[in-house]
A protein has these predicted regions:
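N-terminal Rossmann NAD(P)H-binding glycine-rich loop of SDR-like oxidoreductase domains
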Residues: 4-23
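Conserved glycine-rich Rossmann-like NAD(P)H-binding loop of the short-chain dehydrogenase/reductase
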Residues: 25-36
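NAD(P)H-binding glycine-rich loop region in Rossmannoid oxidoreductase-like domains
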Residues: 55-94
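Conserved Rossmann-fold NAD(P)-dependent oxidoreductase catalytic core, especially the SDR/UDP-sugar
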Residues: 76, 98-137
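Active-site segment of SDR-like NAD(P)-dependent oxidoreductases
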Residues: 80-82, 121-128, 166-169
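NAD(P)-dependent short-chain dehydrogenase/reductase
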Residues: 137, 150-202, 209
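Active-site helix of classical SDR
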Residues: 141-144
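C-terminal substrate-binding subdomain of Rossmann-fold SDR/epimerase-dehydratase oxidoreductases
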Residues: 192, 197-200, 204-301
Length: 301
C-alpha cells in the first residue's frame, strides 16, 4: 500500500513516516520544501531512501490531486499552527481549511476510501474538555474540518479519523506554541537554562505514541467518520520540570506565563474500540527518552 503524507516533512510527519516504513508501507511525502524533511527522516530511519518526495502546496488542489495519484490512503498533516493562524487568519484558513478539503477531494477523485487527518485538542476551549468550543482561529479551523470529514462520509463514504493530539512532545519538537516542554528537555540535555513560556496543566502525549496511532489507523479497515482525543497524561508544567529533574537533577528549567488556551479535562481516547493500541509512555519515560536523544546529539558524543 502506498500512503500519501501531506506535510510529512515536519516533526510529526517524520515520526509517522518512520513507523510506516518500518511496517513495510510505501510512503510518498508532499511538502512545500522537502529538504528539511529529507534530513529528518534520514536521521531517524535506515529506510529513508525508500521515501518518494513531492514538492507541493496543500492549498493548491492541482498539487494535492497530483500527489495523491496512485496512493491508497492519505495521512493529512499539512497545516500551520496557532501563532500563524492568529497572525493571519485568512491565510491560516486557506491552508488549514481549504487544504483539508483538497485532501478529501483528492481522495474522492482517486477512489481513496480512508483519510487520517490531524485535528487538535485545540477544538476544546480553555475550560471545558468535553464539548468543543474553540477560542482560537486554529481550533475553529480544526473543528470545521471535523464537520467536513463527517460530510464526506455521508456524501461519498470516505471514512476518516481526525486525531486530536494535545501537547505533543519528544525528540524534534522545536517549534509551535506548545513546544516548551520539549525545548526544556533539550536545554537540560545540553546543560542550558530554559523557561517554559506557559504554566498550568495540559495533556502531554509522547510523539511516538501519536505516530503509532496514525500507523494503526492506516492499517485499520474502519468505516465512518471519527475523532480521537490523544490526551496522553494530564500534567502540570511543574510536573514536567520535576520529571526533567529526575533525569538530570542539576537541570536549570522553569516555567512562567499564562496557561495554554486548551482544556486539561478531556477524556483520553488512545485506548479505544476502533484501533488496536498498547500502553502509552508515562511522562517520565517520554521525558527520559527525549533528554537521551538530545544528549546523543551533543558535541561531546
Amino acid at each position: 500500500m502506498r500512503v500519501l503524507i501531506t506535510g510529512g516533512g515536519g516533526f510529526l510527519g517524520t515520526w509517522i513516516t518512520k513507523q510506516l516504513l518500518d511496517s513495510g508501507f510505501s510512503v510518498r511525502v508532499m511538502d512545500m520544501n522537502t529538504s528539511p524533511g529529507r534530513a529528518r527522516i534520514q536521521e531517524h530511519s535506515p529506510s529513508h531512501h525508500l521515501v518518494e518526495w513531492v514538492e507541493g502546496d496543500i492549498a493548491s488542489s492541482h498539487d494535492v490531486h497530483a500527489a495523491a495519484q496512485g496512493c491508497q490512503s492519505i495521512v493529512h498533516l499539512a497545516g500551520v499552527l496557532t501563532p500563524a493562524c492568529r497572525n493571519d487568519p485568512i491565510k491560516g484558513a486557506h491552508i488549514n481549511v481549504i487544504g483539508t478539503l483538497n485532501a478529501f477531494e483528492a481522495a474522492r477523485k482517486h477512489g481513496i476510501t480512508r483519510v487520517i487527518y490531524t485535528s487538535s485538542g485545540g477544538v476544546f476551549g480553555p475550560s471545558d474538555g468535553q464539548f468543543p468550543f474553540p477560542t482560537t482561529h486554529y481550533g475553529a479551523f480544526k473543528l470545521a474540518n471535523e464537520g467536513s470529514a463527517r460530510a464526506y462520509w455521508e456524501d461519498h463514504q470516505i471514512a476518516s479519523i481526525g486525531m486530536r493530539p494535545f501537547v505533543v512532545y519528544g525528540p524534534g519538537r522545536e517549534s509551535g506554541l506548545s513546544a516548551g516542554p520539549s525545548l526544556a528537555c533539550r536545554a537540560a540535555a545540553l546543560g542550558e537554562a530554559y523557561e517554559i513560556p506557559f504554566t498550568g496543566s495540559a495533556g502531554m502525549v509522547y510523539v511516538k505514541d501519536v505516530a503509532l496511532a496514525y500507523k494503526a489507523a492506516v492499517k485499520s479497515a474502519f468505516t465512518g467518520a471519527h475523532t480521537l482525543n490523544l490526551t496522553g497524561q494530564i500534567a502540570s508544567m511543574q510536573d514536567v520540570i520535576t520529571a526533567i529533574h529526575q533525569v538530570i537533577p542539576t537541570a536549570r528549567v522553569s516555567c512562567k506565563g499564562p496557561p495554554l488556551p486548551s482544556a486539561a479535562d478531556s477524556v483520553n481516547e488512545y485506548n479505544n474500540g476502533l484501533l488496536p493500541l498498547g500502553a502509552e509512555k508515562s511522562l517520565l519515560e517520554g521525558v527520559k527518552e527525549t533528554i537521551h536523544y538530545y544528549q546523543s546529539l551533543a558535541p561531546s558524543n
